[in-house]
């Protein structure tokens, strides 16, 4: 069957998360319903990452197998029409026909995420639900210095959810940068895969550093504790965005490469 790779944007606010669930609407369910409405086919799509309720995406990547060899342009337009008619907050940004052994999850080399904090006294109006409002002045330079203590290959037990299902807490964090533009603070993270709640745990901990409550040494000590109780508060989902997924130019002809990503990418 023809396999299609799609890049997807969504507002995570109305959904219980990426993954199809019984307790409410999901992004996966919305796209699968659009495919069913368009083609009459019941499909199971796979995403590069399983975001939690309230987490947004600018560049989630999925793949789906369809019986018809659609032109990517027609498939994109048709799916977007069905999503729009259904009132979904989901948009298909790009469609590409790919080899049958491409896998949105297991073929990924790197995943990029963004966490947005608005640091100001006034509550959010336009940005409500799209960023974490912190009514204090945060020192982004201290936050960035603390973030560098987390870069590299570590046991991130401190920064994963208690119910995280990954087999190993060890991950290689390629990048964790903190920048500021006016009242907006951005935390950007890159790795092959992340643990459940890892980035939101980073954001909550780095906020403590920005407030002057923790030093970079305290953040490093929390990492070395390998204990969830040593973590700062978990930041809310509103500020988290799945930005982009990197893939090799040539996808190896194998279904399931053995990498960190074997544990998946169930972060948020």
From Swiss-Prot:
EC nos: 5.4.99.12
InterPro entries membership: PsdUridine_synth_cat_dom_sf (IPR020103), PsdUridine_synth_TruA (IPR001406), PsdUridine_synth_TruA_a/b_dom (IPR020097), PsdUridine_synth_TruA_C (IPR020095), TruA/RsuA/RluB/E/F_N (IPR020094)
Gene Ontology MF, one: tRNA pseudouridine(38-40) synthase activity
Top-rank EC class of the record's enzyme: isomerase
Matching Pfam families: PseudoU_synth_1
Subunit structure: Homodimer.
Family statement drawn from the similarity comment of this UniProt entry: Belongs to the tRNA pseudouridine synthase TruA family.
Protein name: tRNA pseudouridine synthase A
Source organism of the structure: Rhizobium leguminosarum bv. trifolii (strain WSM2304)
């Amino acid at each position: 069957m023809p396999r299609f790779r799609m890049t997807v944007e969504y507002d995570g606010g109305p959904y219980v998360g990426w993954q199809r669930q019984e307790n409410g609407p999901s992004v996966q369910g919305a796209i699968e319903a659009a495919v069913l409405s368009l083609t009459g086919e019941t499909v199971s799509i796979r995403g590069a990452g399983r975001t939690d309720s309230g987490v947004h995406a600018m560049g989630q990547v999925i793949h789906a197998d369809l019986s018809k060899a659609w032109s990517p342009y027609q498939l994109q337009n048709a799916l977007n029409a069905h999503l729009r008619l259904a009132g979904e907050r989901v948009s298909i940004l790009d469609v590409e026909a790919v080899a049958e052994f491409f896998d949105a999850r297991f073929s990924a080399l790197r995943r990029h995420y963004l966490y947005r904090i608005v640091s100001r006294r006034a509550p959010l109006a336009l940005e409500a639900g799209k960023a974490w409002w912190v009514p204090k002045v945060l020192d982004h330079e201290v936050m960035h210095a603390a973030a560098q203590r987390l870069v590299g290959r570590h046991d991130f037990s401190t920064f994963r959810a208690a119910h995280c299902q990954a087999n190993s807490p060890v991950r290689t964090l390629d990048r964790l940068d903190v920048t500021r533009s006016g009242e907006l603070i951005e935390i950007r993270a890159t790795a092959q895969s992340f643990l459940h709640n890892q980035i939101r745990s980073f954001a909550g901990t780095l906020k403590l550093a920005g407030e002057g409550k923790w030093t970079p040494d305290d953040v490093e000590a929390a990492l070395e504790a390998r204990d969830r109780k040593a973590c700062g508060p978990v930041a809310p989902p509103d500020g988290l965005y799945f930005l982009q997924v990197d893939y090799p130019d040539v996808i190896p002809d194998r279904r399931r490469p053995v990498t960190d990503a074997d544990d998946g990418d169930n972060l948020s």
